[in-house]
UniProtKB/Swiss-Prot annotation:
One of its GO terms (molecular function) is mRNA binding. A stretch of 270 kb of the mitochondrial genome is duplicated within the centromere of chromosome 2 resulting in the duplication of the gene. The expression of this duplicated gene (At2g07715) is not demonstrated. Its main location: mitochondrion. Keywords: Mitochondrion, Ribonucleoprotein, Ribosomal protein. This is Large ribosomal subunit protein uL2mz, N-terminal part. Component of the mitochondrial ribosome large subunit. It holds the Pfam family Ribosomal_L2. It comes from Arabidopsis thaliana. SMART domains: Ribosomal_L2. GO terms for cellular component: mitochondrial large ribosomal subunit; mitochondrion.
């Protein structure tokens, strides 16, 4: 019996362009080409790697191949599982804890003259106080012994602080909120005027008073690589991750990670100021109709996956077909359960 030439489903058809034997300039390069009825290509499901079972809806004619095609509605195992490659191949997150109790990096505290000293502190538990340093001791004072308490004398001004607290103490202190006091505090302690989280410039010039300036300090004339007074430096700070004074005024206790995340996050545009997009009456009606369908539930559509497969001469409408994935050991049990549920003969594809 010759199948009826019904119109193919639009979601499974695609058209190809025809040149009729002409090139881009319109000249005939291949003779006896062109004309004929328009042929639409059918998408055939040839790469199904899941064990599934379906019912043949109809047998259709395909003008592009000598065999017939069958429209199959899959009732079991039709949807292929999508593997989340990001979660599968993502490496496990590792939390790196500080193992040394010395400060090192691009902006090392050795450049700050006479106020921050690198000293090893007696750690009571491993990994707990490894990132603490002694602040306030002069550089010429010998380190304290491990038998005595490292923070015994309060008159010397030695305190236990974190590394990030040392770096941001000049910015997060209440003195930094006042403009006059902040300049005097930062200039006396030798902190940089602006800290940039990047590889350039490699050095910075601390702002020091004339009384404190000596041989162990850097001057603006010695450091020519930074050139903080240039226009390019201002644009680099504005465009990249320059730490501004306003960000420190907003948050009194701001960590190094928090400052980096605050600068990396892009400001969101104000959606209220943007003009609203005009919505046509047709779109409003469609939305209202969809809402009614969802509430009533009467107009439910069978959304089972439907595909085209190559049909054999024995395949007819209404028969059961089954796709077997023999690479998996569970295929045999799946086939036995399918035969028990449906005693009709199954066609494996």
């Amino acid at each position: 019996m010759r199948p009826g030439r019904a119109r193919a489903l639009r979601q499974f058809t695609l058209s190809t362009g025809k040149s009729a034997g002409r090139n881009s300039s319109g000249r005939i390069t291949v003779f006896h080409r062109g004309g004929g009825s328009k042929r639409l290509l059918r998408r055939i499901d040839l790469k199904r790697s899941t064990s599934s079972m379906g019912i043949v809806e109809s047998i259709e004619y395909d003008p592009n191949r000598s065999s017939q095609i069958a429209l199959v509605r899959w009732i079991k195992g039709g949807c292929q599982k999508k593997m989340n490659t990001i979660e599968k191949f993502a490496p496990p997150r590792k939390i790196l804890e500080p193992t040394t109790n010395t400060i090192s990096g691009l902006f090392s505290f050795s450049f700050l003259p006479g106020k921050v000293d690198k000293r090893k502190v007696a750690c009571f538990s491993p990994g707990l106080m490894a990132a603490y340093v002694v602040v306030g001791l002069p550089t010429g004072m010998p380190p304290l012994s491990s038998s005595k308490s490292a923070f015994a004398s309060k008159g010397a001004g030695s305190t236990k602080t974190l590394v990030k607290d040392v770096f941001f103490s000049a910015f997060s202190s209440p003195k930094a909120k006042r403009e006059t006091a902040s300049l005097a505090f930062a200039s006396s302690f030798g902190f940089p005027r602006i800290a940039v989280a990047g590889a350039k410039p490699a050095f910075f010039a601390p702002r020091m008073r004339q009384k404190v300036r000596g041989k162990s300090t850097f001057s603006l004339c010695e450091v020519q690589k930074g050139r903080t007074h240039s226009i390019l430096w201002a644009h680099r700070i504005k465009g990249k991750a320059g730490l501004s004074w306003q960000s420190f005024r907003r948050q009194d206790t701001l960590g190094l990670v928090g400052a980096a995340g605050h600068k990396k996050s892009k400001p969101k545009t104000d959606q209220g100021n943007l003009p609203a997009k005009p919505i046509g009456e047709r779109a409003k009606q469609l939305k209202a109709l969809r809402g009614l369908r969802a509430k009533d539930g009467a107009c439910k559509v069978d959304r089972a996956p439907v595909t085209y497969i190559i049909a054999s001469h024995q395949l007819e409408a209404g028969k059961m077909v089954m796709n077997c994935d023999w690479s998996k050991p569970s295929t045999s049990s799946f086939l036995q359960s399918a035969q028990n549920d449906h005693p009709k003969p199954l066609f494996t594809v």
